[in-house]
Amino acid sequence: MTSSVVSNEMYVILGASGNTGSIIANSLLSAGKKVRVVGRDSGRLQRFVDKGAEAFTADMSDAAALTKAFGGARAAYLMLPPAKSREEQERDSDAIAKAVKESGLRYAVHLSSYGAQVPENTGPLVGLHASEEKLNAISGLNALHLRAGYFMENNLAAIGMIYGMGLVGNALLPDVKLPMIATRDVGNYAAQRLLHLDFSGKQTRELLGERDLSMTEVTAVIARGIGKPDLRYQQLSYDQVEQALIDLGVPPKGAALYVEMYKAINEQVVVPLEPRSPENTTPTSFESFVQDVFVAAYRGKTSNA
């Protein structure tokens, strides 16, 4: 398919320094597009400026600044920052939606999550549900909500536990299977949809990764990758996980949200709506992720300890 997008039209990328946003920004720049990268830290945007992007510093809760950031743009990649509280999620999604409406933006690819169809009791996914609804209420906006699976990168949080305790642990049941996706696959998919702008109205697309995996299976792949064949998965209590998140610097309200999400996954409240298909399956296997990303991060941790 060839793009119908005029080459001098501007693309705006929120969260450009993050895992998905950086992939999108680099893809669009490589395709010769005009790109405006938005973030709170101008220093983290400099690598894109060096490639020809325009940097715009703004907080995601500042509707006036975001309206300026979206000014004159044809399309944007929208995402909420990591959840620190429901109140902050609401402020951010309110500001983004207001800016989209007031700027007259016509196309948006919005990072959401599988399970965002559920309106309550799913932790940070409730905020994504609300964000989808706010964007859906904007007339004239063509919005594509990407309901991505559980990020493979979330498993990087286990590195410290592997090094310190010799196990992988979180609140998920050992054998509950969930779709796991590499953020690079999300970024690549979003970039292609932005390049083509081949969607209209309000649409959702689940992205379910290469296959569904349980934490027992995840741990086995990690064990092979890092050469620790005896590594095992241990389910931790919700209270243990909540405290561990707080110890890692997650605000208490945010930690409670993530625990609520784990409960919803365990209880099969958070599940994909779409059957797995070629359209929602992405190429990066967890084995590839471990080889390409996890092992290097693990070795970096152990060498710096």
Predicted regions and their residues:
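Oxidoreductase cofactor-interface core, primarily capturing Rossmann-like NAD(P)-dependent enzymes
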Residues: T2-R47, S61-A64, G71, P82-R91, ...
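A hydrophobic C-terminal alpha-helical subdomain
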Residues: T2-V5, G225, D239-A305
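Short, conserved active-site loop motifs that form the nucleotide-linked donor/cofactor pocket
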Residues: G52-A53, A143
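Cofactor-binding loops of NAD(P)H-dependent oxidoreductases
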Residues: A58
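N-terminal Rossmann-like NAD(P) cofactor-binding module of classical short-chain dehydrogenase/reductase
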Residues: F70, R74-Y77, V109
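Phosphate/nucleotide-donor binding subsite
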Residues: L80-K84, A264-E267
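Structural motif detector for alpha-helix initiation sites
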Residues: T183, M215, Y238, S285-F286
